[in-house]
Amino acid sequence: MQAPFTNTCDPECSRQRLLLVLVVALTLQSCRDESLVAIDADAERRLREASDSIREPASVPLLNQTESKYQGTPFTADSPGLNQPPTVNPTAEELDYQARLKQKLDADRVIREVTSTSPPPADAERFNLSKSFQYAIRKSIEYRVAEETYLLIALDLLIQQHIWSPRIFDTITPQVQGVTVDSAQSTALQLVNELSARQKLPYGGEISASILAQASNELQEAVITGQTNSIDVALNLNIPLLRGAGLVAQEDLIQSKRNMVYGARAFEDFRRRFYIAVFSDYHDLVVQQQVIANTRAQVERLRSIVEREDALVESGRQVAFQADLAKQRALFVINNLATLEEIYKLAVDRFKLRIGYETDKAIVIEPEMLDLDAPTIDPGQSIASAFEWRLDLQTARDRVVDSRRKVDNARNAVLAGADFFATASLLSNPDFFNGVQLDDTFNNWAVGMAVDLPIDRTIEEVNVRKAQVLLEQVDRQFVFAQNTAAVEVRQAARRIDRALYTLALQDKNIDIARNRQASIDAAPDRASPRDRTEAVDELNRAENEKARALREVQIAVLEYLRQTGQLRVSDDGEIIAPPGLQVRYRRGAGLLEQPAGIPPA
C-alpha cells in the first residue's frame, strides 16, 4: 500500500537539492587521489605474498623506488609540439668543427705522464663487492625496470580482484528538456540518479541491484508549474548453465594470479642474473687493475734493461741496435699501458651505468675477488637439479598448463548458450527526497531461460583449433627449454674445469717465467736484450692470464650455481650459501699471491 504523494518543494528547495547532489559528486572525485595510497599498500602486500610463495622473501621491489615523478593531470594540455614533436638536426653547413693544431709531441713527457701514478680524488666513493650490489638494487635503471615490471603484474591482479568484488556505481544526470504537453511548448528540468551494485558469481553470471530515481520540474516562463518524482528498485540475476559456466568465468582472474607467481619467479631469476652481471663487471675491473699493475712492473723491468744496455753501449761492450731493441720494446709496452688505462676508465664508467652511479663522479674500486671452492659435479644430478629447481623452467612448465586450460575454455565457447535469469522490481512513486515507501509485494518479476542454439559456431571451432596449435607450440618450447638448460648446465661444468685448468697452467707459466728471469739475472752476460725483454713479457703475460683465470673460476662457479637453480642472493649483496659452500674473498693488493681461504670481513 503506497502513501499518497504530496509535493511541498518550492523552486529554491529544488535548486538546493541539485546543488547538494553536485557537491557530493565533486567530493567523491576529490577522494580519488587518497585511494592511490591504498592501492600501493595492496600492491605491496600482493608482491610480498607472491615472493613468499616461492620462498624468496628478499625478492620484493621497493615501491618508493617505483613512484612516478609525474602525477598527471585530468586533461592533456595543448602545445605546439603535441602532434609533431620538434627535432634538432642541423645541416652540415650549420655545424662548426675546430681542428686541432699540429704540433710535435714531447715523447719523454708523454712517457712520464703514462708511467706516473696519481692518487684518486679525496671525495671519491669506495666500492667493494657487496656495496656495489646494494647500490645497484637502489639505483640501477636495469633493476628498477625489473621491479616495475613485477609491480605492473601486481597491479593487473588488483584490477582482476576488484572486478570480482562487489562494485557500486552511481550516475547522476541533470538535464533540461523541451517538451510539448497538449500542444503547448514547455521546458522541463530533470535530475536522474542511477545507483547500482553488481557482483560476479564464481561459476559464471552476475547478480545486481539498481535504484533509478528521477525528479522533474516543468518550467514555464521561469516558473515551476509542476513536479514529477519517481523511484524504481530492480533486482537482477543471470546464471549461465552451458557456455560461460564453470571456472571459465574466472579465467582472467586465474591467469592474473598465476602471472603473479610467474612474475615473482622472473624477478628472482633476474636478481640472480643481475647479481652475476654486477659481480662479473666488478671482477673485470679488479682484473684490469691487476693487469695495469703487472704492466707497470713490466715497464720498470724493461727500464732497468734499457739502462743496462745503454751503459753497455757507452762502454763499447754492446752494439747500439741491441739497446734500441730494448727501448723499442719498452715503448710498445708503455703504449699498451696507456691503452689499458683508457680501457679501464671506460670500464669504470660502464660499471657506474650498471649500478646507477653518476658518471661524472669518481669512485674507487677496492681490490676484492670471490674465492669460492669449485663444486664436485655429477652431470646427471646437476641436470636433474636444474629441471627441478630452475624458476624459468617451472614457469615454462606451468605455461603448458595454461595453454591446456585455454583449449578447455575454447571448447566451452562452442557450447550452446543457456542462461537462467530472474528479475524483480519494487516500484514506488513518492517524493524520494522526503521519504520513500516501496511496494514490497514483488508483483513485478520475471524468471526465464535464454537459449542460444549453436547453429553458427565456426569462429569458435576455429579458435579451438588455434588453441590446440598454440598448446603444441608451448609444449615444444618447454621441451626446448629443458634441453637448453641441460646444455647450459654441461657448459657451466666444462667452464669450471677449463678455468681451473687455465689457472693451473698459468701457475706453472709464472714459475717458469720467474725461473727464466732468475737464470738471466744470475748470468746477465749470457743473455741478449731480446732474451731479457722476452722473459719480462712472458712473466707479465702469465701473471695477467692468472688474474683472468681467477676471475673466470669464480664467475664460472656462480654461473653453475645459477644454471642448476642453487644460487641465492640476499639484499645486502651476499651469497646465501647452501651447506658445504664457504664464501671467502681475496682482498687487497697482491691478489695473485694470496692463498685461498681468506674469510669474509
Per-region residue spans from a language model:
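Periplasmic alpha-helical coiled-coil/stalk elements that build and connect Gram-negative outer-membrane
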Residues: Q160, F267-S385, R495-T502, S519, ...
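Sec/SRP-type N-terminal targeting helices
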Residues: R144-L152, P202-Q227, L242-R271, R296-A297, ...
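Small/polar, glycine/serine/threonine/aspartate-rich low-complexity segments that form flexible
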Residues: P74, Q84, T115-E125, I172-N236, ...
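C-terminal motif of bacterial Sec signal peptides marking the signal peptidase cleavage site
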Residues: T27-S30
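Regulatory alphaC helix of protein kinase catalytic domains
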Residues: Q71-Y135, K139
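Amphipathic alpha-helical coiled-coil scaffold segments and their short linker/junction regions
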Residues: A136, R198, Q318-K327, L331, ...
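Acidic, low-complexity, intrinsically disordered peripheral segments
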Residues: R32-G81, D349, E358-G380, S428-F432, ...
